[in-house]
Amino acid sequence: MKALSKLKAEKGIWLVDAPKPEMGHNDLLIKIKKTAICGTDMHIYNWDEWSQKTIPVPMVVGHEYVGEVVDIGQEVRGFNIGDRVSGEGHITCGHCRNCRAGRTHLCRNTSGVGVNREGSFAEYLVIPAFNAFKIPDDISDDLASIFDPFGNAVHTALSFDLVGEDVLITGAGPIGIMAAAVCRHVGARHVVITDVNEYRLELARKMGATRAVNVAQENLKDVMKELGMTEGFDVGLEMSGVPSAFRAMLDTMNHGGKIAMLGIPGGEMAIDWSKVIFKGLVIKGIYGREMFETWYKMASLIQSGLDISPIITHHYKIDDFQKGFDAMGSGQSGKVILSWD
């Protein structure tokens, strides 16, 4: 089968002929229709320090996808040949305390599709049936292929009550932009998103952000005054991993504010902890998606009218995968879809 593999311990990714994956009694074999390129895939492509420590070489990568079930393990129930599915990319152990308590997104033994095991940048993928999610008929393949990052946005945004609240999102990557759309859809008052990438800020405006602020050109506190905000942000969603952005968030949060953090800093990050203490802030770390509450909410949000389609800006056939990675690397894109049909 065709597959994109991290074939060498250097920058790049390679289109190869790989063996079709073998499945077990509890697995599904999925014929991939579309995949999307994630920021994690770009880390792997660029072979940065994290990738060098984490990714086995060679390995098929990728974890954002939609496909069709073409074979079913003999112990599997609830799925049929022809079902259209995406899937949870975090494979959990099932036996740790959190798994047994139903908090599988907090499994201490999580293995990542396309990170620790063979991924979805291939014509076929095998995953445990437990991890598969049936896609409703009224949700397109394009949208289904980005359910993984959309789930990060939904999990982060819905961590706290948003109705009538003022929300600050730091980092206008695709996940931050989708989070802005979610916040507006569920009833937030002002949704302000910050970045320095004007292309992505314009995407955020199209997706419903009240204000998309280029912090290299505008002062966040001036924007708050223009919006008539007299206190501070009630909810903060940190999506950038940039220390200066997080410090700006701490400066502008209201007392008693709540922060959900998805962005991963490049190293240790110093902050003024007295602001956290004296403001009584709550900080929650976010990793992945809640299984499978987030997945059901994703489908319901789209079915209730949330439009995240503008975040998809580029489509390529798999043979043109290099153009897709170049588009992602340029910073002048939203989500990039690769078609395997």
Swiss-Prot record:
SUPFAM superfamilies in UniProt: GroES-like, NAD(P)-binding Rossmann-fold domains
Protein location: Cytoplasm
UniProt entry tagged with the keyword Metal-binding: yes
Pfam families attached to this UniProt entry: ADH_N (PF08240), ADH_zinc_N (PF00107)
GO molecular function term, any single one: L-threonine 3-dehydrogenase activity
Main location, first listed in the record: cytoplasm
Cross-referenced SMART domains: PKS_ER
Signal peptide: none
Required cofactor names: Zn(2+)
UniProt pathway: Amino-acid degradation; L-threonine degradation via oxydo-reductase pathway; glycine from L-threonine: step 1/2
GO cellular component, one term: cytoplasm
PROSITE patterns per record: ADH_ZINC
Binding-site list for NAD(+): I175, D195, R200, L262, G263, I264, I286, Y287
Entry annotation: catalytic residues: T40, H43
EC number: 1.1.1.103
KW Cytoplasm (keyword) present: yes
Keywords, comma-separated and alphabetical: Cytoplasm, Metal-binding, NAD, Oxidoreductase, Zinc
EC class of the enzyme, as a word: oxidoreductase
Superkingdom, taxonomy of origin: Bacteria
GO biological process, alphabetically ordered: L-threonine catabolic process to glycine
Binding note for cofactor: Binds 2 Zn(2+) ions per subunit.
Family: Belongs to the zinc-containing alcohol dehydrogenase family.
Descriptive protein name: L-threonine 3-dehydrogenase
Organism: Shewanella oneidensis (strain ATCC 700550 / JCM 31522 / CIP 106686 / LMG 19005 / NCIMB 14063 / MR-1)
